[in-house]
Amino acid sequence: MSQVSAVDDIVSEYQGIEAQMSDPETMGDQTLFRKLSKRYSELQPIINVNNKLVQARDDHEAAEEMAYEDKEFAAEAERLAEEIVSLEEQLADLLAPRDPHDGDDIVMEVKAGAGGEEAALFAGELVRMYQRYAEKHGFTVEVLGLSESDLGGVKDMTLSIRSKTPSRDGAWSVFKFEGGVHRVQRVPVTESQGRIQTSAAGVLVYPEPDEVAEVEIDDKDLRVDVYRSSGKGGQGVNTTDSAVRITHLPTGLVVTCQKERSQIQNKARAMQVLAARLQAMAEEQAEAEAAEGRAAQIRTMDRSERIRTYNWPENRISDHRIGYKANNLDSVLNGDLDDLFSALQAAERAERLEAE
């Protein structure tokens, strides 16, 4: 399909969605309206760039005609010609193949791996890094479940990270790169001899379905247990039996939620996490032979299966998938992940274009 034909199809779809969203019946159906809003936000950048391109071409044609009579317009025509080239490149980039989940919210699990208490402390630092990045970029973060270590580290934490409004580039578009084993090299706070040690934490990331109903889950396949929430020091912990643990019997997947005040709310959020994990599992199985990112996520907490290393003594971060290295570990841990994510996105885009 030519670029012109592709843009025409998108303009037609965009206008159709616009008409649907202004229909009172659609506005009364929040599920449908949310889906349309999401698709609308995905198409809007393409429409905006295409509109600028159409205008620039019209202006360029007019400037060239006027340049015959007034040489001052020659410079304007030249500037517009350069703008057209830039806009054409932007449009081609927007039309390039992309991950269909890029606009999605996510569920993230961070687990301490090899390294005991030090691994749990490192897992906690990863969580704070993601929270700071999310705050800087307008995402909302919700803690769904937490198990802490004796020193306040994270043994296991489940997070929901969401866009505040529908977006073409949602949480999945950046956080999907975090799935895998993260290795840390430093002197642990528990080390009395001052020796550098290696520990690890694992991260799992799943795109979150818009609705639990989108994923088939049979009630007969579920075991639901209710228990009293627990946390280090008892701070901010519910004193009623409101925490919920759901086991999906066919797969053995277990999800918990203890953040909300009621069993009903905790069960609803746990079901959302389960739906995300089942959806990811189904897609992973379907793509088992394709080298997709989700298929390459962590399987064990083995320190050798690493995607990234955080070297404290040298203040260096290394992403082993793309050969990225930078000596700004301190700022990265403060949530400054833009350069790293841009490099990972560029590598993914190049890989997708090559596969076409």
UniProtKB/Swiss-Prot annotation:
Domain of life of the native organism: Bacteria
What job does this protein perform?
Peptide chain release factor 1 directs the termination of translation in response to the peptide chain termination codons UAG and UAA.
User: What protein does this entry describe?
Assistant: Peptide chain release factor 1
Q: Which family does it belong to?
A: Belongs to the prokaryotic/mitochondrial release factor family.
Main localisation, per the record? cytoplasm
Record-level Gene Ontology MF annotations: translation release factor activity, codon specific
Q: Which UniProt keywords apply?
A: Cytoplasm, Methylation, Protein biosynthesis
UniProt key word Ribosomal protein: no
Q: What does the PTM comment state?
A: Methylated by PrmC. Methylation increases the termination efficiency of RF1.
- Return the GO cellular component terms, semicolon-separated: cytoplasm
| Leader sequence residues | none
Where, subcellularly, is it found?
Cytoplasm
- As recorded in UniProt, coiled-coil segments are none
Residue positions of the PTM N5-methylglutamine?
Answer: Q235
Q: Which InterPro entries does this one have?
A: PCRF (IPR005139), Pep_chain_release_fac_I (IPR000352), Pep_chain_release_fac_I_sf (IPR045853), Prokaryotic/Mito_RF (IPR050057), RF-1 (IPR004373)
**A Pfam short name:** RF-1
Keyword Nucleotide-binding in annotation? no
